[in-house]
Each structure stands twice: as C-alpha cells, then as structure tokens.
C-alpha cells in the first residue's frame, strides 16, 4: 500500500516538472519581460532620434508674415545716403515712432529724440493773429502723416516702389510723408468759401508736389522725386452766361 502511494507521488511530481511553461505565466520581474521592455525602449529612442533628425533636415515651412518681416529686416541702407542735405525734404521723415502734429495743425512738429534721422525741421509758418472778424479759409484742408505708402509716381511719370521700412545700423526706421489734402471739395454749396457765385464757378482740389523719397530700384535703395499731396487750392471758372 505504501509502495503504491510512493509511486503516485513520484508520477505527480514528474508530471509537474515536465509541463511546458507558457510566456503568459511569466512573472513581471522575469528576464523575458525585461528583454521585451528594453527592446521597446530602444525602438522608441531610435524613433525619437529619427524624427529629430528629420525635423533638422526638413524644417517646418515659415509663415508668410514671418517671411515678410524677414525680408523687411534684410533691406539694409547705407548711412551715407542720409549725409547729403540735398536729399532731405521737409515733408519726408525717417523715425522709429510716429511724429505728432502741432495743436493748431498749421505747422509740422517732429519728435525731439535721437531716433529721428531727418534733422531738417521745417520752421513754423508765421500766421496772422486771429481777430474777432471771423477769418476763414477759402478751402478746408487736412494734414496727416502717411506711414504705409508703398507706390508713387516719380518725376518721369513711372510707378515706383517706395520703401516703407529702412534697416539702418540694425534698427528699423519707418519712412513718413506729411501730406495735405482737401477735406471737402465744396465747403459751401456754391463751391469755395467767399467766392461770388453769381459770376464764378468754384471748387476745391488737392494739388501735388515732388519730394525726394527713398525708393527701391531692383535690389538697391535710391533717392527719387515722387509726387505726394501737398496743398488744397480753390479753382475758379468764369460763368459763360455773363458774356
């Protein structure tokens, strides 16, 4: 009886040791699991390295705004262009900040700072003192600083490209134009103010003048005479029915 019990116990132990071990029953700390985790980590590291190298070889395309800003910053101007006084104009200013108008808007006042390149400041025009008689202009005008002028007509009648921003000594300056134009072509129903409408037809119109401005000629910056609005005048025409 005891011999039979020993035989059954030995057969049971042999069956347990002979059973194959499945990979699903491997403990978490077993060498097989460690090899798999090391392999996946190595593959992940290689993938990150490959993607990083790909990004360096093929960088992401830049936005259009970034390209425009870069192109503006690349337009470098020689400071010698500003040393000749004949190229300076009282209606053209290079500055890093917008210049203000005077309070009465009858003269030009520039910012008194070290950033302004154009030191040729036009003196204020002397105006007669306003009395109680009620003096009025024939035409109403408005004067503004124009900062984003990109195109203009030169003295030869050709359309040229005006430089909006200028890179000088690693600092960006903007080119401003002081322009004057008519506020209204007919300040009064009959046309210009103070004109005898019984004998004359009249209206207000904006006139232009030439100023030196910095323009682009191919890939080079050059001075050119361009037309800008500079005044508002009254045009009168005699009525033909009086003849």
Curated annotation (Swiss-Prot):
- Entry keywords, A to Z: Cleavage on pair of basic residues, Disulfide bond, Glycoprotein, Growth factor, Lipid-binding, Metalloenzyme inhibitor, Metalloprotease inhibitor, Protease inhibitor, Secreted, Signal, Toxin
| Chain segments carrying region Disordered | 47-67
Disulfide pattern: 139-204, 182-232, 192-234
Instruction: Kindly report the protein's main subcellular placement as a broad class.
Output: secreted
Q: What is this protein called?
A: Venom nerve growth factor 3
Superkingdom is: Eukaryota
Quaternary structure, from the entry = Homodimer; non-covalently linked.
Q: Where does tissue-level expression of this protein occur?
A: Expressed by the venom gland.
Q: Which family does it belong to?
A: Belongs to the NGF-beta family.
Keyword Secreted in record: yes
**A Pfam match:** NGF
Q: Which organism is it from?
A: Tropidechis carinatus
Q: Where in the cell is it found?
A: Secreted
